[in-house]
Regions:
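Oxyanion-binding and handling regions
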Residues: 1-42, 50-56, 89-127
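Short glycine-rich anion-binding loops that position phosphate/pyrophosphate groups of nucleotides
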Residues: 13, 66-67
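A generic structural signal for short
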Residues: 32, 68-69
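DPxDG-like acidic metal-binding loop motif
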Residues: 60-65, 71-89
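Short, active-site-adjacent cap segments at secondary-structure transitions
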Residues: 69-70, 101
Length: 127
């Protein structure tokens, strides 16, 4: 079961970060239209720091695999994989069409319906 997690949705439309920690859920919406690797890392660091989150092997990252922006999807995956390697946390992915609305209730439905995949990553790009 995925308990505490960071969810990254950076596919070029309504980009957001979500954080579930100790049964609470927080959302951060990007202010920029285009996301860069540096800005995504900055947003994630500040978001985790503001909620006093410590990344460890019990923590998970869930990434939106698209379809969506090629660069946004690749940046999300690269940043997530970097955290996985450096912090030994678990990585999961989901398809954008499976998450009807970016909130905890719908994310938990994804988990319950086994629509979050551990076999990553097969991103879907729009061209």
């Amino acid at each position: 079961m995925i308990n505490n997690f960071l969810i990254i949705s950076c596919i070029g439309k309504d980009d957001k970060l979500g954080l579930r920690i100790n049964k609470e859920f927080f959302v951060y919406k990007y202010e920029k239209k285009e996301i860069s690797r540096e800005s995504l890392v900055f947003y994630i660091q500040n978001f985790l720091k503001s909620h006093k989150v410590k990344l460890d092997e019990k923590f998970s990252i869930i990434v939106n695999q698209g379809p969506g922006s090629f660069s946004g999807t690749r940046i999300s995956l690269a940043v997530a994989k970097g955290l996985v390697i450096s912090k030994k946390i678990r990585l999961y992915g989901y398809k954008d069409e499976d998450l009807l609305e970016f909130n905890l209730k719908n994310i938990e439905i994804l988990m319950k319906n086994k629509l979050i995949e551990k076999k990553l990553i097969k991103p879907i790009y729009l061209s």
